Design a protein with these regions (language model features):
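Charged, solvent-exposed interaction patches on well-folded alpha/beta domains
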Residues: 2-194
Length: 194
């Protein structure tokens, strides 16, 4: 024995923080392994919560449920794209195990469905952001559904509908409220020099 101990250390890089439905928090690293939270450091990573039934035993472990694997796949896709990494703040899993994304800009929910065809879904969302939102406005939609192939379904906010109806009525009322005297020409000749 040569009295030499060799130690290899590799640091895990968390890319996702999951808060499961059992009120357990844990990170998932870049390799898809669950790791416990640190008492000394909080990683600034994408958060996922909702109906995620992935158990956590407090130690490094693999992902066991299909929904956790889909959430990881989605988070990995988002972190590798600078636009979506800046735009998406949170992943939420609803009771039907459908993935929703919460953006940093805008109040709408982005319904992703599952983690299939992420390139196509995010490309469709990009086109919607580029073409529809500049015309309609960022607060127009309460949800943007990108889970279907080759289509984006936007559901308008009820308040936006009411605002546009009220704006149309206000415009019509303002046209009616213009007094007739503003449109008539006065025939006052007292100031004309002869």
């Amino acid at each position: 024995m040569d009295d030499i101990i060799r130690v290899e250390i590799s640091q895990r890089q968390p890319i996702l923080r999951i808060m499961n439905q059992f009120d357990q928090d844990f990170y998932v690293d870049a390799h898809g392994l669950k790791i416990p939270l640190s008492e000394n450091f909080t990683a600034r990573v994408l958060a996922a919560n909702g109906y995620i039934d992935e158990p956590f035993a407090g130690k490094v472990d693999t992902l066991h449920t299909a929904i956790a694997a889909e959430v990881f796949k989605t988070a990995d896709f988002i972190r590798n794209d600078s636009l979506w990494s800046a735009q998406i703040a949170q992943i939420y899993v609803d009771q039907n195990h459908e993935i929703e994304l919460i953006p940093r800009v805008g109040n709408q929910r982005i319904i992703l469905g599952n983690a299939d065809s992420l390139d196509a879904k995010f490309h469709n969302l990009y086109l919607f952001y580029k073409k529809a939102l500049p015309q309609a406005g960022w607060g127009t939609y309460k949800s943007i559904n990108i889970k279907y192939a080759n289509q984006v379904v936007g559901v308008r906010n009820q308040s936006t509908k009411q605002d546009s109806i009220m704006a149309a009525r206000a415009k019509a009322d303002s046209v009616k409220a213009v007094p007739d005297t503003a449109l008539t020409i006065k025939n006052d000749t007292s100031q004309i020099k002869q």
